[in-house]
From Swiss-Prot:
Subcellular location(s) of the protein: Cytoplasm
Subunit structure: Homotrimer. Binds to both RNA-binding sites in the C-terminal region of Rne and to RhlB.
Name of the molecule in the record: Regulator of ribonuclease activity A
Pfam families: RraA-like
Task performed by this protein: Globally modulates RNA abundance by binding to RNase E (Rne) and regulating its endonucleolytic activity. Can modulate Rne action in a substrate-dependent manner by altering the composition of the degradosome. Modulates RNA-binding and helicase activities of the degradosome.
Organism field: Actinobacillus pleuropneumoniae serotype 7 (strain AP76)
Length: 165
């Protein structure tokens, strides 16, 4: 289903938080939504890989990389792992790489910027902890909705049937 964050903001204005417009879309899917799983890490993607090995249907991985864009936290290998395990999308408060391939994969990916340098693979960080960036606090189990216009957050699953009316 295509997500329209503008329409969701109009319908659910009192139930959503809007993330500051600092993200760009780098995946092959322009809109996605799901229940948040968070990873907090810095220039290391080993923990990200561990989480992406889990079943991801209905889930979006939200990565707090501290806003650092010196090393890419997501590359084609991790994006393919996410796709293989059914993840709906990935949002990275940090960088990604290998855009030529990322944009062909059937998964939503939003991040701050691209850079060719990869992250190390240490499993350092935290999983399912509240993270704050873009002017909002993301709690595990919240729902995130993303499209080319922006990213919004809700503590509850929104009724997307409202978009079809």
């Amino acid at each position: 289903m295509r997500i329209d964050t503008s329409a969701l903001c109009d319908i659910y204005s009192d139930q959503v938080d809007v993330v500051e417009p600092i993200f760009s879309s780098f995946g092959g899917v322009s809109s996605f939504y799901g229940k948040i799983t968070t990873v907090k890490c810095f220039e290391s993607n080993g923990l990200i890989a561990s989480v992406l090995e889990e079943e991801g249907q209905g889930r979006v991985l939200l990565i707090d990389g501290g806003g650092a864009v010196r090393r890419a936290l997501i590359d084609t290998e991790l994006a393919q792992l996410a796709l293989d395990n059914g993840w709906e999308g990935i949002i990275v408060y940090g960088a990604v790489r290998q855009l030529d391939v990322l944009e062909t994969l059937d998964i939503g990916i939003h991040a701050l910027a691209p850079i060719p340098v990869g992250a190390d693979d240490n499993e350092i960080g935290e999983v399912d902890t509240p993270v704050n960036f873009g002017g909002v606090t993301f709690f595990p189990e919240d729902y995130v909705y993303a499209d080319l216009t922006g990213i919004i957050l809700s503590p509850e699953l929104l009724d997307l049937a409202e978009l079809e009316e």
